[in-house]
Amino acid sequence: MESTLKRTWAEIDLDHLTHNFEVIRRHVGDKVKLLGVVKADGYGHGAVEIAKRLEQLGAGYLAVSNIDECEELRDSGVTLPILMLGFTPADQTARILQLHMTQAVQSYAIAKEFSDRAVALGGKMIVHIKLDTGMGRLGFSCDEAHFDASLREILRVLSLPGLEVEGVFTHFSVSDEDTEESVEFTKLQHERFARMIEKVETQSGFRFQLHHCCNAGGIASYPEWAWDMVRCGIILYGSGDLAEKMGMQPVMSLKTRVATIKDFAAGEPISYGRTYFTQRPSRIAVLPIGYADGLHRALSNQIEVLTPYGRAKQVGRICMDMCMIDVTDLPQVKSGDEVEIFGEHILCADDAAPVSYTHLRAHETRHDL
């Protein structure tokens, strides 16, 4: 897929998505279900197209961050189970049932309200119980101080008549980091997860159909903790250091064209703030891409881009709609030449932005993906 907007555009390679999916499948084993996270319009890649390809590839589940994202997928014909990872107000119960959406529940109170409303509507809501093992966000707290109280609440959730409890999951906070402290904390999170599951299943006689804890970092570094399913988020899109180490291919390439080229004498300032001065007589090319397109201003004077004739350093402060590159050593570069900001041939998105999630998502509002 390629945008028709030729000022600056993103290209999405679904064959690279297929490659990444198969890499993950081999890494965790073919008995483990793969859940594809397609929240935030598939991290800016186009949720519908990504979801349909994942469905063809045999993904077991999808995940979104709000009910509207689920509705978009259902309206497009996607039939895979869809997990809503975060919070949904209980007054949306009818929509949840209508869309056959699986809802995460993080407290007995919210579970009870969902159950009551589902019973009143003559339905049953599929839910996954969310455990907070150290993220400090949503979920039943599994630290020592709250463990017993959370266990009692979860056992009560299992008996609610309007719910079909299908799964249980948690989210690692530092599984993508390899410091000794981070590794130990990730192990602690997994120990808490396993302990709560063992207590719930032993005391109730109930067994969850799906247990999942591995996000990108978990998939890459702890495949032995795959349980029944892993959640493939940013790593599926080939972005970040972990994806690179696993041999993933970037699904998105961000490209633009040279707008114009100007000659400067040595010692002349480029762009806002006079943060860069030419060190010699220079040819400076202007690109029609800036921080409004996701090329963060903090990257000013730090990155390189790829022209048809080699790499060029970005110089001067990145503007809202434009940035400049030094093509002094690339005399063949001319107006209209295609320039790759990141993609298959240069820079993973992690290098091209402080936070790859933000970077990939930022292109959606400016470019037709």
Where are these regions (language model features)?
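Short, well-ordered loop/turn sites that connect or cap secondary structure elements
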Residues: A298-L299, L306, V333
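A charged N-terminal "starter" segment
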Residues: M1-T102, Y108, D116, K124, ...
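Functionally critical, mid-to-C-terminal surface segments that flank or help form catalytic/ligand
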Residues: L254-Q302
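Active-site loop/helix belt of alpha/beta enzymes
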Residues: L5-K6, A40-L57, K112-I126, T133-R257, ...
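Conserved small/polar residues in nucleotide/adenosyl-binding loops
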Residues: T358-T365
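Short, surface-exposed secondary-structure boundary micro-motifs
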Residues: G290-A292, G310, I341-H345
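Short, Lys/Arg- and Gly-enriched loop/turn segments at beta-strand edges
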Residues: I346-V355
